[in-house]
Structure formats: C-alpha cells, structure tokens
C-alpha cells in the first residue's frame, strides 16, 4: 500500500513538473552583444557663458528626452499579430505479388540423372504468393489566430551602449479585483526614434521582448489543469 502511494506521488510530481515545463516563458536578460558592448562614457560639459541651455538639474531650456542610465522613457506598446495556417496529407501504399522458383530440366541420355533431375524439380515446384498489404493515411489541420495588444508603460534605461543606443527594461503590475496583470518589456532603442515628448513606439525596439500575463481565478478558469495537460502530453494516441 505504501509503495503504491509512493509511486502515485512520484507520478503526480513528474506530471506536474512536465506540465510546468511546457509553459512558454521569456528570458528578459540582455542579449549577449549588450553585455559585451562597453558602456558609453559621459564627459561632463562646462557651462558656456551666454548659453540658454544650462547644466543644472532643471535648466530652463533642455532636452527632456531620456539620455542616461536610470532615465525614464514611456513605451507605447502597439502590437498586432495574425496567423492563418493549413496543411493536408494523403498517403497510400500497396504491396503484393507472386514468386516462382526456377525449373530444373535434364537434357542428357543418362536415365539415372534424368530421374534425379525430375525428383529435384518436383521438390522445387512451388509458387510463393506474397500477401497483399494496403495502407491509407489521410490527415489535415488548420489554424487561424489574431491578437491585438495596446498598452502604455514606463521603462528605465539600463545601459547606454558605446554607439549611443539604449538597452531599456520596463515592468508594470496592476491588481484589480483579485486579477493581477503583469507587463514586461525590454529591448534596444536608438535615441533618434524617441519623440519630443519622451515616448517611443514598440515597433522601434530591436530584440524586443514583450510579455503580458494575467494571474487570478478568472484567468485560471481559461487554462487546463496541470494533471489533464500532463496526461494529454504523455498519451501515445
């Protein structure tokens, strides 16, 4: 009894682990080239007499766009994705036939050898008929999907690369009536693509990673239970 319970617990644990491993995930660590590229060195500029652009914390005239590490920038996420896929397969095969062994004939005058040849020919006088085999397979499938995502969030400049590009990362969490919404964005942007109001469209993000997740009872009701998912994954048919 204990052994059966132990085996059941092990099977349950394996099924849970395999079901969890099948969930898609995104790694938000910076790409390798971002880690390998040196950071840009910022050389402090001296105040210029008569210049309208001051060097203080809040000068009267200044570029309000994000420029340095830890500066904030607003990302306008506008992503649309659609896919239409169909496939079909039809396979047929058949096999069958007969096999006849060669005949043995003696054309000489020796009666003994003639009888031996007739005896051997009689023993070898068989036909082999191969059984017929027919195989048919037909399958197909289609998929159509469309998704729209429109969200605005703020991100922080993590690193300014040597060529002036920024690696940014943003995280936003909203909890409404027990439902938690999590949005994560990361990518590399060019300073020239930042608007004057310090916003940038998500289409300008290179190596973009965008993750939108819902957590709560409502979102759980739209997902398969891990046990059912694990069983369907391991079923051979």
Curated annotation (Swiss-Prot):
Its main location: membrane. Keywords: Bacterial flagellum, Cell outer membrane, Membrane, Signal. It is found in: Cell outer membrane; Bacterial flagellum basal body. Residues 1-21 form the signal peptide. Residues 87-111 are annotated as: Disordered. HAMAP family: FlgH. Assembles around the rod to form the L-ring and probably protects the motor/basal body from shearing forces during rotation. The basal body constitutes a major portion of the flagellar organelle and consists of four rings (L,P,S, and M) mounted on a central rod. Belongs to the FlgH family. It comes from Helicobacter pylori (strain ATCC 700392 / 26695). GO terms for molecular function: cytoskeletal motor activity. Transmembrane segments: none annotated. One of its GO terms (cellular component) is bacterial-type flagellum basal body, distal rod, L ring. GO terms for biological process: bacterial-type flagellum-dependent cell motility. This is Flagellar L-ring protein. PANTHER family: FLAGELLAR L-RING PROTEIN. Pfam families: FlgH.
């Amino acid at each position: 009894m204990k052994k059966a319970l132990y085996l059941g617990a092990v099977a349950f644990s394996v099924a849970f682990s395999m079901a969890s491993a099948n969930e898609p995930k995104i790694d938000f660590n910076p790409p390798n080239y971002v880690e390998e590229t040196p950071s840009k060195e910022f050389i402090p500029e001296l105040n210029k007499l008569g210049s309208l652009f001051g060097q203080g914390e809040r000068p009267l005239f200044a570029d309000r766009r994000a420029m340095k590490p830890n500066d904030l920038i607003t990302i306008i996420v506008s992503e649309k994705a659609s896919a239409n896929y169909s496939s079909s397969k039809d396979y047929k095969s058949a096999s069958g036939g007969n096999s006849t062994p060669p005949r043995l004939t003696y054309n000489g005058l020796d009666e003994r050898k003639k009888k031996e040849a007739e005896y051997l020919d009689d023993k070898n006088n068989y036909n082999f008929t191969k059984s017929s085999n027919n195989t048919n397979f037909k399958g197909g499938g289609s998929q159509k999907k469309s998704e729209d995502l429109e969200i605005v969030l703020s991100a922080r400049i993590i690193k300014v690369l040597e060529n002036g590009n920024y690696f940014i990362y943003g995280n936003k969490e909203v909890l409404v009536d027990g439902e938690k919404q999590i949005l994560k964005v990361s990518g590399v942007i060019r300073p020239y693509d930042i608007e004057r109001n310090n916003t940038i469209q998500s289409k300008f993000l290179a190596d973009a990673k965008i993750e939108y997740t819902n957590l709560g009872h409502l979102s759980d009701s739209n997902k398969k239970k891990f046990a059912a998912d694990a069983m369907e994954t391991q079923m051979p048919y």
